Curated annotation (Swiss-Prot):
One of its GO terms (molecular function) is actin binding. GO terms for biological process: endocytosis; endosomal transport. PROSITE patterns: EF_HAND_2, EH, WH2. It comes from Aspergillus fumigatus (strain ATCC MYA-4609 / CBS 101355 / FGSC A1100 / Af293) (Neosartorya fumigata). Residues 892-912, 935-953, 973-1009, 1054-1087, 1101-1129, 1136-1153, 1279-1288 have a biased composition (Basic and acidic residues). Residues 201-236, 491-526 form the EF-hand domain. Residues 25-48, 77-101, 919-934, 1183-1197 have a biased composition (Low complexity). This is Actin cytoskeleton-regulatory complex protein pan1. Component of the PAN1 actin cytoskeleton-regulatory complex. The lineage of its organism: Eukaryota, Fungi, Dikarya, Ascomycota, Pezizomycotina. It is a peripheral membrane protein. It is found in: Cell membrane; Endosome membrane; Cytoplasm, Cytoskeleton, Actin patch.
């Protein structure tokens, strides 16, 4: 609120008489050289006496202080004026090596200017000084004691909390009020005006604030009134209006606090104690009750000199004031930590003080100037030097020195320049209501000099912040809270992350008090321009962390040293040899010299039985025949202390305690027994439930499939897979070896063939050289042999052999063949590698499939524990085994049932064929072997038997004798297996009976009444007995029987083969028929798809033309709307005139009734009224004519309204998408658009532009647009409804109805004007029986005024008035499937005939086709309806010819069928 500092610098001080502005005061170093005082050579440095001189030209300062024979005066603290020559030498003079130090102020001469000495009434508070200064102050004030000034009671503000401001604001306002009024209780109007003007509010607003704040109407403000004024200023600055009157609550609070302050002010002030120059050592060193607020806020104005002069009386000193040696007219150079008040000097009314200025006095650490009382800027560097010939050095203000160890926390004072903006940072980060509404970081940044270490003031502020945020006193602040606190500082997120990393070195995610102080100090440094360090300096490491780390390091070093010493001394190996504990020397308490060395600690403990007090018998410690040793003194003392009665009493008490303990133990044992019994009952109930669940699982029809995925079979298959995988490399090596052999054989075969084809080739020469090489002699011999063979052939009359080839031809042929063989070998090698890789991949896939999902060691352990009963108690083991036995029994029983049912089914299936019943066990065995519940070995055997049987059948069919196996026959094996199954079933039934008996006994013992006792399982029907064998009567009968059996088998085989062949033929015929039907359907679907694509292309072309028309019609419509609005305005004006005329007529009628005369007044009335009557008569016709235009075509309006909505939706959507940024508005508009456009349209690039997609950032909005614009196969009717709307539908609502006929004529003459009829006939021709063209022609004249050629769907809502379901009102049909997935039509229902061709474009527009009636939900749209095999090609050709402009001839359609889904339009 007080962000401007201009008012502190020049705005207020200009109004003070006798004092120039702050920036225009004469500098302290511009006094002439001749007027500078020269100290007297008396051996002492002149000291300030605190009094002004009577005459500056005659009196000199008194010589006091230290001898200065070899010393020159030096400016320490706030120096006086220096000559101009000294100022010019500031930058170039080098000080000597040894600079004598001098406390005090050098003598200064007084300028001849007149200044009024100012006095202050602020209480004196002394800051720390050196001992020499304190001694000098005693010597200076020893002679004369100034008269005591009156003591002020001070500004006392009651400790009352105001509810309309926060506690922080109230404390800030208290500081501001105290600094402004000093010891007074009220603030006068001028001071309040100065403070309120800093808010930069207009004068009218400040006047209202003053009227509301000055509740006492005294022209002065008490503190509650001042706080109220600040509160009202804040309201107005934040943009809220000022109340006209104060609320009662605020008014009562302010009035009550004002009364308390008024009653607490005494009538007369007591006489205060005399003020001396002796510092007050009892006051706190840093106490400053009159200091202004912290520098981060602009400091209020100090009281003026005139006010202090009016409060303080001048004190005579007995002689003329003396020169103090201080620089006159010294500028205000104090900061916020000035703690000393100036002293009054001299008589203020003396005329001799015309050469004196106001004197700043006090101790030298922080002297305060009295010439200016405004806000003090930070202290700039001061020049110092030696006397008049030495230049001064640039030094800053006296900074507070740390009083503790360097780098220690909390012992560093604030720098001399203070901590700017620290209070603002505190107020910003304090938890307060309304902070979520927004905050500003203005005023937090600065460029102050901040040390690394945390100062006392900072630590206190940060601790207060920590306690304020740690409301639950957890001792730490979590990450979420720290983010909220640190985020209010306005720093970058990366800087805050680095600060958090430095403040939380342990990565705990929370900060304690010291770590929070480190984080806040780093934030404060960053706000003042310091970078965030990469690692914490030693000054910022919290003491707790540093001490903890040191302690941990010390413990680690002790442990490591102890381990090394024990290792070196061998104490690890022979502890009994030393007999001492080395831990004793390294005790945590210290070394051998520590005070507690004699005491034992936790490093070594040994129980001392001797130290036990009480009675102890010595009979156990008698040694041999020695006398009984004396009891220890402790035992004697205990016996002496306790008498027999006391011992008996203790025994009784102990007995009582033991009995109580026994009773508790008995109770506990009973409770444990009850719990054990309850646990047993629960365990037994759980076991029963488990048995019942297991029985349900075993008896479930799908329980047989549960055995397919057991662990044993998986492991067996994995072992087989591993064995096969091990065989793969061996097989691959064998393949490669065979490939090599094949290649070598091919090469050798080629050599042989080549030698046979070229017998005289050089390749056939046998080499006799080393290594079988061919030499020149071998070639000569070969040529000689060839010549001899040629001569012999010539003599014998045989053909002469071919000449010998050269060496190159044979070699080339061999190389070519070798390359070909090598290429084939490499190709085969690549194939082998591919096969190996494929086998490996297949093996990996099989291994993954054979692995149990989620198989881990824990899962395997649990599975083996509860399935294999490993590591469980005996009861649980017996229970698991019982469940497994029951499961196996149920599995065997179910397997027998399945086999029996399969056998019965096969017998039932083979009954028609004679003689097959005796072979029924064989197929039953085969089918049973392939059951899922059988084992792997059974399935393998069954597969082998089936393969053998098929081989035998094929051999028998080929006339070959099958191989006779001397081993067990099929019938014998089946008999054996049947006996084994019967035995297993019998054992399973016995186990079931035993288990049921056990269960019944257990139920009887538990005395549980069950309503439905499960009955014993009924015995299963035994499988049919094997075919009985005929007894052998004699050998002849046996031969006949065997022969008859063979003939029967042969006949059965022949019949079976004939049946198989017939079945195969039937299957082939059925397959051919299905293939032909599928091919036919595919052709029909392809034709339908082509026709649909052609229709879609035509529709797209018409949609494009319709868009162009809509753009033009939109412009016409907007113009019509504008004209309609103008007409409506004119009509409104005419209605107003009518009303006024009516009112005038009524008034005139009243006047006529009041008139008593009947002469000329009756005639004059109608004469005046007639024009006014004519006006409403003419204008009243307009409202009746105006609605007549839409009445002429109500059907078109009703029909066009839904289409207008759908057609106009996309342009509005485009506008909204490009302009609106509101996500909620986008979502609402998207939902509305989705409801209006119910069916997906044909992709229309003009409706959704790329620009709209770019500007829309809502992902759901983009997804909805993509789904809306997705080009799916939809019906033609939804496409037409979406893309083509009546452009003149909106014009029907206007008052001007003259555009209907003209627009209709224009539509007829357009190139695509007649396309609507064609499109309507195409769309709805398959949905309803087409009407004859004669009927359409009859209806066309009556409908000529309606623009049907542009809106064929306009008549869709008409059936809605009759109660039938209309297309727009019905929910949108589901999207049709793609053409390839169209279901086959029902052949029993004839397809609808093709639509009647519409008239040519030049012909008059016919009436609209009848719309579809109420459609059932599963009915697809017209375009994706049942295909018409005969009409589809003609319709496609017809549509193509229509597109080319071909004229259509009139045809007569005979409606032979009526579609079940077609509707009818009621006229």
């Amino acid at each position: 609120m007080y962000s401007s500092s201009n008012s502190f610098l020049g705005g207020v001080n200009n109004a003070r008489p006798g004092q120039p502005p702050f920036m225009q005061q004469p500098p302290y170093s511009q006094l002439p050289q001749g007027q500078q005082q020269i100290p007297q050579q008396t051996g002492f440095q002149p000291q300030p006496t605190g009094y002004g001189s009577q005459s500056a030209s005659h009196l000199q300062p008194q010589p006091t202080g230290f001898p200065t024979g070899q010393l020159q005066p030096q400016f320490t603290g706030f120096p006086g004026a220096a000559p101009p020559q000294q100022q010019q030498q500031f930058g170039g003079y080098q000080a000597p090596a040894q600079q004598p130090q001098l406390t005090g102020y050098p003598p200064q001469s007084q300028p001849p200017s007149l200044q009024v000495p100012s006095t202050t009434g602020l209480p004196t508070r002394l800051a720390p000084r050196t001992s020499s200064e304190i001694a000098n102050s005693f010597s200076d004030g020893a002679g004369v004691a100034p008269p005591p000034p009156p003591k002020s009671s001070g500004s006392k503000i009651p400790n009352i909390r105001l509810s309309f401001i926060t506690a922080q604001d109230q404390a800030k306002f208290e500081q501001l009020f105290k600094s402004a009024v000093g010891d007074s209780q009220t603030m006068d109007g001028e001071k309040a005006k100065e403070l309120l003007l800093r808010s930069r509010l207009p004068g009218s607003e400040l006047s209202k604030i003053w009227v509301l704040s000055d509740t006492t109407k005294s022209g002065q403000l008490f503190f509650p009134e001042f706080a109220l004024a600040m509160y009202l200023c804040n309201l107005r600055i934040t943009g809220r209006e000022l109340p006209s009157t104060l609320p009662d609550k605020i008014k009562n609070e302010v009035s009550g606090m004002v009364d308390i302050i008024s009653f607490g002010v005494p009538d007369t002030e007591p006489q205060g104690a005399a003020r001396t120059n002796v510092p007050s050592f009892d006051a706190p060193l840093l106490e400053n009750k009159s200091a202004p607020p912290a520098p981060q806020h602009p400091k209020p104005q100090q009281p003026s000199n005139a006010q202090f002069l009016s409060q303080l009386a001048a004190q005579p000193t007995g002689f003329g004031p003396q020169a103090t040696g201080l620089q006159p007219n010294q500028p205000s150079l104090l900061g916020a930590n000035a703690t000393l008040a100036p002293q009054t000097t001299g008589f203020p009314g003396q005329s001799q003080q015309q050469y004196l200025h106001s004197q700043p006095t006090g101790l030298m650490t922080n002297p305060q100037a009295t010439g200016y009382n405004g806000p003090r800027p930070p202290l700039p560097p001061m020049p110092t030097g030696f006397g008049s010939n030495l230049s001064s050095m640039q030094t800053g203000g006296l900074a507070a020195q740390p009083t503790g160890i360097p780098g220690q926390w909390g012992f560093v004072n604030a720098p001399s320049s203070g901590l700017p903006n620290i209070e603002a940072l505190k107020q910003q980060l304090m938890p307060q209501p309304g902070r979520e509404g927004g905050f500003t970081t203005a005023g937090l940044s600065g460029n102050a000099s901040i040390p690394w270490a945390i100062t006392k003031e900072e630590k206190k502020i940060y601790d207060d912040l920590f306690r304020a945020w740690d409301g639950l006193h957890k001792g730490f602040i979590g990450g979420d809270t720290a983010i909220e606190i640190m985020g209010q500082s306005g720093l970058d997120r990366k800087d805050l992350e680095r600060i958090w990393t430095l403040a939380d070195p342990s990565n705990r995610g929370r900060l304690n008090m010291d770590e929070f102080a480190v984080a806040m100090h780093l934030i404060y440094r960053k706000l003042n321009g310091y970078p965030v360090p990469n690692r914490l300096p030693p000054e910022l490491i919290p003491p707790s962390t540093r001490n903890l780390n040191d302690s941990i390091g010390a413990v680690k070093s002790l442990l490591s040293q102890d381990a090394e010493s024990r290792k070196a001394s061998g104490a690890f190996l022979q502890p009994q040899k030393t007999g001492v504990s080395y831990l004793k020397e390294h005790s945590f308490r210290g070394g051998a010299r520590s005070p507690g060395f004699g005491r034992k600690d936790a490093t070594l403990f040994k129980n001392n039985d001797e130290a036990a007090a009480g009675y102890r018998s010595s009979a156990r410690r008698r040694v041999g025949n020695d006398a009984r040793p004396s009891s220890p003194p402790t035992s004697q003392a205990s016996e002496e202390e306790l008498s027999v009665e006391q011992l008996k009493k203790k025994i009784r008490e102990t007995q009582i305690m033991l009995d109580a303990v026994d009773f508790k133990d008995e109770n506990r044992a009973e409770e444990d027994e009850v719990l054990d019994r309850r646990d047993r009952l629960e365990a037994e109930s759980l076991m029963d439930r488990t048995r019942r669940v297991q029985d349900d699982i075993d008896t479930h029809p799908n329980a047989v499939f549960r055995k397919l995925d057991n662990g044993a079979e998986r492991r067996s298959l994995r072992r087989q897979l591993q064995a096969f995988e091990d065989q793969v490399p061996q097989i691959a090596s064998e393949v490669r070896r065979i490939e090599r052999e094949i290649a070598d054989a091919k090469l050798e075969l080629f050599r042989l063939k080549d030698a046979k084809a070229h017998p005289n080739s050089a390749a056939n020469i046998v080499g006799t050289g080393p290594g079988g090489t061919v030499t020149e002699a071998d070639r000569i011999k070969a040529r000689a042999r060839a010549r001899m063979q040629a001569r012999a052939a010539e003599l014998a009359g045989r053909p002469v052999p071919a000449s010998v080839d050269d060496d190159g031809a044979a070699v080339r042929r061999l190389e070519a063949e070798s390359a070909s063989i090598r290429a084939d070998r490499e190709k085969n090698e690549a194939m082998t590698r591919d096969v190996e890789e494929s086998v490996r991949e297949f093996t990996r896939s099989l291994e993954d499939s054979l692995k149990e999902e989620g198989e881990t060691s824990t899962r395997e352990h649990e599975r083996r524990r509860w399935e294999d009963a490993l590591g469980v108690e005996d009861v649980i083991r017996d229970f698991i085994y019982d469940l497994q036995r029951g499961s196996r029994t149920a599995h065997i029983r179910k397997e027998e049932e399945s086999r029996a049912s399969a056998q019965e089914q096969r017998l039932r299936h083979e009954e028609p064929s004679p003689g097959v019943s005796r072979l029924s066990p064989a197929p039953s065995a085969g089918s049973a072997g392939s059951l899922p519940g059988s084992t792997h070995e059974d399935r393998v055997a069954a597969a082998r038997e089936r393969a053998q049987r098929r081989i035998a059948e094929r051999m028998a069919a080929a006339g070959l004798k099958p191989h006779t196996d001397t081993s067990e026959t099929l019938l014998q094996r089946q008999e054996r297996e049947k006996r084994e199954r019967e035995e297993r079933l019998r054992r399973a039934e016995e186990e079931d009976a035993k288990r049921e008996q056990e269960r019944q006994r257990r139920l009887a013992e538990e005395q549980r009444s069950t309503s439905d006792t499960p009955a014993k399982p009924v015995g299963k029907k035994p499988p049919p007995a094997p075919p009985s064998r005929r007894g052998r009567t004699d050998s002849a009968g046996q031969a006949e029987v065997k022969k008859a059996a063979e003939e029967t088998i042969t006949a059965e085989q022949a019949a079976r083969e004939q049946a198989i062949r017939e079945e195969q033929q039937a299957q082939e015929e059925e397959t051919n028929r299905l293939e032909m039907e599928a091919q036919k359907r595919e052709e029909e679907l392809l034709k339908e798809k082509e026709a649909q694509e052609a229709r879609l292309r035509a529709l797209e072309e018409q949609v494009r033309q319709g868009k162009i028309r809509k753009q033009e019609e939109k412009r016409r419509k907007e113009e019509a709307e504008r004209l309609a609005k103008e007409k409506e305005a004119a009509l409104a004006a005419q209605r107003a005139e009518i009303e006024r005329a009516k009112e005038r007529e009524r008034q005139l009628q009243l006047e006529l009734e009041r008139l008593d005369e009947e002469s000329s007044s009756d005639d004059e009335g109608p004469v005046n009224i007639t024009p006014e009557d004519s006006t409403p008569t003419q204008s009243q016709l307009l409202p009746t004519v105006t609605p007549a235009a839409p009445v002429s075509a109500p059907e078109s309006e009703q029909a066009g309204s839904p289409e207008d909505t759908s057609s106009q939706a996309p342009p509005v959507d485009f506008k909204l998408e490009t302009e609106s940024k509101n996500p909620y508005f986008k979502i609402t508009h998207q939902a509305t658009d989705t409801q209006v456009v119910s069916s997906p349209p044909v992709p229309q690039p003009s409706f959704t532009s790329p620009k709209a997609d770019v500007h829309s950032t809502n992902p759901f909005h983009r997804l909805a647009k993509q789904e809306t614009s997705k080009p799916a196969f939809t019906g033609s009717a939804p496409l037409e409804r979406k893309s083509r709307a009546r452009p003149e539908a909106d014009d029907d609502w206007s008052a001007a109805g003259s555009e209907f006929d003209s627009s209709d004529d224009d539509d007829d003459e357009r190139p695509g004007g007649g396309s609507a009829k064609q499109l309507a006939s195409i769309l709805f021709g398959t949905m309803a029986p087409p009407r004859p063209l004669s009927a359409m022609d009859d209806k066309s004249p009556s409908k000529s005024s309606t623009p049907v050629q542009d809106s064929p769907v306009a008549s869709l809502p008409v059936p809605e008035s009759n109660g039938s379901l209309s297309a727009p009102a019905a929910p949108p049909p589901p999207p049709p499937p793609p053409p390839a997935a169209v279901p086959s039509y029902d052949p029993s229902v004839a397809p609808p005939p093709p639509p009647a061709p519409p008239m040519a474009p030049p012909a008059p527009p016919p009436g609209p086709p009848p719309p579809p009636g109420p459609l059932p939900p599963p009915a697809p749209p017209a375009a994706s309806g049942p295909p018409t095999p005969a009409g589809a090609p003609d319709r496609s050709a017809l549509l193509a010819s229509i597109q080319k402009g071909k004229g259509l001839r009139k045809v007569q359609t005979n409606d032979r069928s009526t579609s079940s889904i077609a509707g009818r339009v009621l006229d």
